[in-house]
Amino acid sequence: MKLGIAQTEFTKVKDIVIPDIFYNRMKSGVQDFDKLFGDGLLPGASITLTAQAGCGKTTFALQLLEHLDQAGYDVAYASGEENQYQLAFTCQRLNVKGVKIANITDIDTIAEAMDKNDVVVVDSFQALTTKTKMNSRALEAYAISTLCNKAKDSECVLIFIMHLTKSGQLKGSTLVPHSVDVNMMISHDMENDDDTTRIISVSKNRFGQTIDVQAILGHKGFHIGEKVTTGKKAKSKKDRKSAL
């Protein structure tokens, strides 16, 4: 059963059979990553990964994809921010080898790629384009409708990388985070002077818990620590959530 199927008749909860897809999570095999999504990624889910420049969005996404590739999943990274060689150079530093990368920004082309992959990262949502000329609001609505529906129909996990302004506000409208299933944010840990410390926050999860995890961003990527806040706000979370 696909996530996108809507039921229009009222049914008693006791008579509803939960489809297997809700229990067949895609696991990377790395517990620290899987716990962020509620013990793995739900096939067909759409996710935003938001942060200011330099916080590690690309690094996190590539690491996650590499772990999933090693677990046997087909994964792809569609970049409109860096060319294939720049991205491959970053992958070399992170020891990422199995992720398929390409410079694709066209929405329909990405949708086609989702039929052939289990997880697709789009870097970034703000860089998406169409063959037909549209204003920014129409393009945003088309991207959400096309790609999020494709995720549900194909059971491909879709991850949008999102940018924040220097003031910490989301670039564009807030339609995207309201439309997806999971909102994830990476931010500097305000309680630490160390520039390498990050907080990875899941502030919305339709299929699992919300969670905050402390992580260290080093030259070789993220090391996710054990400091976890589940189901409640961390001290500095209010400011991070205000961007969404």
Residue ranges and their predicted role:
Residues 99-103, 129-141:
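Flexible beta-alpha connector loops of hexameric P-loop NTPases
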Residues 141, 145-244:
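Phosphate-binding/switch region of NTP-binding enzymes
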Residues 83, 104-109, 165-169:
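Short acidic loop-to-helix transition motifs that present clustered carboxylates
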